[in-house]
Amino acid sequence: MREEEAAAVVTVPQAGRDGEQPGPPAGLGCAAVRGEPGGGGPQESRKQWKKFLYCEPHKRIKEVLEEELYIKRDECHIKHPPAVALEGIWSIKRNLPVGGLKPGLQSRNSLLPQAKYYSRHGGLRR
């Protein structure tokens, strides 16, 4: 969103009051909305636009909200540390055959993954 769009929020046009006819915001390029000749008729040119300015919350309110966000994030990390959470899902120790081999008996083929076959009748087979 551009800065001009963030500063002014435009609502539906209302019928003109006191003969004022301010133009629509700069971001709208439709001829019918602007009330330009040949683009919507005289009724469109009599409508007035309401503008609302966005005001940020007070600095202290923003700080309190950020503190609450950080507290919730820290509580989540204490309950479920990322390393421990992943350990339950996938583990090198459990999923890969590493270690347990004697250094003198290692061969090239023993380090390769062994073929595993699944059968719906017998389960997992090697």
From Swiss-Prot:
Compartment(s) where it occurs, according to its Swiss-Prot or TrEMBL record: Cytoplasm, Cytoskeleton, Cilium basal body
Origin: domain of life: Eukaryota
Segments of this protein annotated with the region Disordered: 1-46
Keyword line: Cell projection, Cytoplasm, Cytoskeleton
UniProt protein name: Uncharacterized protein C11orf97 homolog
InterPro entries, alphabetized: C11orf97-like (IPR040429)
Taxonomy of the source species: Eukaryota, Metazoa, Chordata, Craniata, Vertebrata
Organism: Bos taurus
Gene Ontology cellular-component terms listed: ciliary basal body; ciliary base; cytoplasm
